[in-house]
Amino acid sequence: MTCRNGAGDWKDKTMNLEGKRVLVVGSGKSGAAAAELLRKKGITFVLFDGNKDLDVAALIGKNPVFAGAEILLGELAPEDMARIDLVVLSPGVPTDLPMVNELRNRQIPIWGEIELAYHFAKGRIIAITGTNGKTTTTSLVGEIMANYFDDVKVVGNIGIPYTSVAADTTEDTVTVAEISSFQLETTREFAPEVTAILNITPDHLNRHHTMECYIETKESITKNQTAGDTCVLNYEDEVLRRFGGTLHTKVVFFSSRRRLEKGLYLDGEDIFYADGTTDTKVINVNELNILGKHNYENVMAAVGMSLSFGVPMDKIVEVLKRFQAVEHR
């Protein structure tokens, strides 16, 4: 089976959206944030929602950004498709719907809200994906960054759309993004400086159809990284261990089961960082407020990302000692 992402083969990092007509698919939180960003940038958008019985008045009351916009419900007619230059797809909309396939066949570029935000955002980016542990790790990395940098934004699948903050970023902004497999399906140029894939276990196969496609989607978070960028991977995940050997980026592994010559590892109750020459103790797990092997793995991933991003170890440890568990969503 051929895995299909949402964006097809279309690629143009310098696309000028001025004068373009953008179709926003989905009227929920993600769609509203995308529409708000487009409106801020003076770009015309059309809203589409597959619910033909959607209460438009209630929708506009909840999301005034849709007031005055053209709103299409139920089905998208061919004449409507002909007027569209770009599609922004909400993460909850499957990329293999007949309508999406038809838009793709018409060579209309299809982005997700992450890609749209990246098009306008400035600054440096850290992105985190994985089947489990994303929210805890993203929150921890966000707090570490805020302990060292002045302008930090934590966005993505954690609950804050990237599009809602993209217009407020500067070259000094550090953005920490939790990225789901659904969001990765519709990224094309998104290029984080540091990425992490925490683990990969069977999930969302009703959407991705096969484990191979799910893995491919998760691994695509690295596709635009360069040799100077870094990917942090779980050494104890066999898929990710093999994947690390194929990357042209810097790779930092972490392990909860064995000592690593380079990377982060758990030895008894101590977490160490090994640079190939020296093994440095980072913290004893009893000094943490989050317990369990899965959380120690999240901590090691966060430390690996933060060190790769240039944060001093002492600034990292300060946050590790005070970080509290994230409320389960």
Over which residues does each language-model region extend?
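Short linear Ser/Thr-Pro motifs
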Residues: 30, 90, 180-181, 255
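Residues at the C-termini of beta-strands that transition into short coil/loop
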Residues: 75, 114, 156, 254-257, ...
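Phosphate-binding loop of NTP-binding sites
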Residues: 10, 37-40, 78-82, 91-235, ...
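N-terminal leader/targeting and accessory segments in enzymes
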Residues: 3-112, 116, 291, 301, ...
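Adenine nucleotide phosphate-binding catalytic loops in nucleotide-utilizing enzymes
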Residues: 20, 25-27, 209-212, 249-329
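Short, glycine- and charge-enriched coil/turn segments that flank and shape catalytic ligand pockets
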Residues: 51-70, 105-107, 148-151, 168-173, ...
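Residues in the short beta-alpha loop(s) of Rossmann-like NAD(P)-binding domains
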Residues: 28, 51, 158, 236-237, ...
